[in-house]
Amino acid sequence: MELIAFIPSPSRGVIHLGPIPLRGYAFCIIIGVFVAVWLGGRRWAARGGLKTTVADIAVWAVPFGLVGGRLYHVITSYELYFGEGKDWVNAFKIWEGGLGIWGAIALGALGAWIACRRRGISLPAYADAVAPGIAFAQAIGRWGNWFNQELYGRATDLPWALKIDSAHRPADSLDVATYHPTFLYESLWCVGVALLVIWADRRFSLGRGRAFALYVAAYTVGRFWIEYLRVDDAHHVLGLRLNDWTSILVFAAAVAYIVVSAKLRPGREEVVEPAAVAAADASAQGTDPDAKDTKDAKDAKDVDAKDADGHAADAKKTEAGEAESDQNRDEEDGAAAVDAGAKTAKNL
């Protein structure tokens, strides 16, 4: 029986503009990063930070995250790149797909921590601001799997089943054309996670990393059941895929962090970025550091001018005093001469 409704897969995942290839997978990642930075910047500014800070820190976090995501994928799926008949160079071809979210978060957090430390910013506060944006970025990035026709689920004939070309089907089911669109499931789930974090943050004023922990916990719940549907090769431990076990452990850690931190450090940070506070104070006073420097220079110049005028006036007074003294001395000498002449005349 042929399905009359299904989700088609793109005929190709790359479009060439002359010698330049435009890959759908990379395009989705780039769009996701821009959305995350844009939303994170708005949320950071709403918390009292500078609008440009999120983008500045992303310059560190994004490259670290991409490297971490690729490393996690290669390590957990090493059989795809190493061994007989495999070319290890393919491990570097990130544009062909293959990023592990846990590696991306771990190494991306390291890059963000380095940048935050350089600016005197708390990493948990920054993570809270960017958490919904990361979820939206994942929602967009998952469509890269659609372009590559990868990471789909089990065979199904549901109306929203995803049609996979024969070249991308599992070797043991080449005659099956439609599968669960797990990329779509995770994309929608991530949108829901982002909205949940935004709502909870407004409702409960989450701070000190708890908004980010909520994002992690909520994401792992969806990742667990979506991972269970996937049919791509993966390592299994006690009957579960490796990423399922990772989801369980990360979920437990995130929930524990929310509970413990809420007791030890309730509330939200009052100051998220010292530089923003300084800028706000300067703005409130109607000055800025550059203007202050200019004013100080002008005041110093005025003082120098006054000192110069004072010295000139003193010099004039001194000259006038000396001239007056000379005049008085001449007058005294003249008077003495007259008296002497008068006495001489009298004696004669």
Kindly give the residue locations of the regions a language model identified.
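A feature for loop-to-transmembrane-helix boundaries and adjacent hydrophobic helices
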Residues: 1-348
